[in-house]
Amino acid sequence: MTLQPTFEGRTPEQCLNVHTDSHPDITGCQAALFEWAESYDSKDWDRLKQCIAPFLRIDYRAFLDKLWEKMPAEEFVAMVSHPHFLGNPLLKTQHFVGTMKWEKVDDSKIVGYHQMRVAHQKHLDSQMKEVVAKGHGHGSATVTYRKINGEWKFAGIEPNIRWTEFGGEGIFGPPEKEENGVAADDQVMNSNGSSEVEERNGHVVNKAVEVRSV
């Protein structure tokens, strides 16, 4: 068997540190990954709650310059489901996962390295006929999985954006206009994906959603 190249200083043997008796674990991680991607793209936030760990490591430094070492699950769901983020009903997405490799850290933690393409398409209104913004990211993601009460859960992500299509200006933030024609409020995330945040009483505050810096 040809060994894969070294990844982030790890030897090929370490990157392939999943043996035959670990296949049920990998199947469990794949199931959690599938549920995560499908819950995002279908905007089924109850489904998302079922596949994530109680605490997650969210490393969004690639596009938000923010890192949360231990974000509670309820805060993670609130953040990604916000109408100015993936919860916008006018925003269509697909989180497409390509080939992958696995590293078993211990009996309750596995790290997956996944090729990713994430497509975003934002529409003008609920008719979903006119597209006002597009942005597709290509790269990879490092995903952490943890075994909770015998079941593997999605427990963190670190995207690595290699290149993008269409720029993505205007993807995140409020709709171009409200259904009644009234202009929406100021955009929360700019074209680079960085958010307007401030530090207040030891908390990182986003005008779209408050998440605790831990």
UniProtKB/Swiss-Prot annotation:
EC number of the protein: 4.2.1.-
MF term (GO), any: lyase activity
Domain of life: Eukaryota
Keyword entries, A-Z: Lyase
One Pfam family it belongs to: Scytalone_dh
Gene3D superfamilies assigned: 3.10.450.50
A biological-process GO annotation: monodictyphenone biosynthetic process
InterPro entries named in the record: NTF2-like_dom_sf (IPR032710), Scytalone_dh (IPR049884)
Active site (catalytic residues): H95, H120
Pathway: Secondary metabolite biosynthesis
Name of the protein this chain belongs to: Scytalone dehydratase-like protein mdpB
Originating species: Emericella nidulans (strain FGSC A4 / ATCC 38163 / CBS 112.46 / NRRL 194 / M139) (Aspergillus nidulans)
